[in-house]
């Protein structure tokens, strides 16, 4: 669908091969290839990749693509009415309340990064957030494809025009991680570059089992749908969510509803990690608290922000809200 829509707009759409590589477990990659072939997807095992270090092989996915998401969104939303600065304070079946009144609709989709209905869906148990970092390096070798490590904390690589985009340093929001320092050390070692041309960070919402939550918000909220927990595959999963939710609202089945069901079992190992993280945040002795559910805020010296490790809310140095699920600013003057 992206390829079809991209033909109608200038969004720097580029067809490229994609690779998932491993540094340690080539057998895992071979099993992945076998599973993909069984399902009928074009994929192959390759031993040589265009990266500055040795790998144990990779899965190659031919004819994948990258594009500029803001230009793409500007095009597909050109005929829509988008109301900014309309902060939703309460969401219920059939209505959404904000400072200026109430919005009503028979069907509603909640698609924030982190859903904010604590009394429905138990999202505060089922979701957590991750930070990751990117540096853009100019005039370095073309890796001729898009690469991501199969390990959660691995590196990613792809080119855009004259730049190589190197990503990594991932960690749970509010916890110490590699961050910019890890990324800077890597580009210095492998590319001899002391300072990147551009650099930025991103935040992703993660589900307990790595599968997004797409479907009815909860059994007790008829007509209210949700799409969240896209992990680090937001552009891919958002299109899948659009298709699934459209079919559900129109009363048609896709066959994928049970896979992405937001009410599926949450008894996963990550649930216990989330629970322990929340308990640690609640019991940490500090006056600086997240307004979402009262967890302790921790100072992030690399980005000069106050971060919550429980659910991933982030605040500027003066307490102004940056990332949800918190719905307001934090009091950090204490």
For each feature predicted by the language model, list its residue ranges:
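Flavin (FAD/FMN) cofactor-binding and adjacent substrate-gating region
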Residues: 1-72
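A short, glycine/Asx- and small/polar-enriched loop/turn
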Residues: 27-30, 52-56, 91-105, 207-211
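Flavin-dependent oxidoreductases
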Residues: 91-160, 167
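Rieske [2Fe-2S] iron-sulfur-binding domain
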Residues: 135, 284-334
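A structural signal for short hydrophobic beta-strand segments in well-ordered beta-sheet cores
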Residues: 88-91, 156-157, 214, 297, ...
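C-terminal catalytic lobe of FAD-dependent flavoproteins
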Residues: 35, 45, 63, 151-152, ...
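Short loop/edge segments at beta-strand edges and connector loops
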Residues: 15, 47, 84-86, 90-92, ...
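Helical element adjacent to the flavin cofactor pocket in flavoenzyme catalytic cores
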Residues: 35-37, 58-107, 111
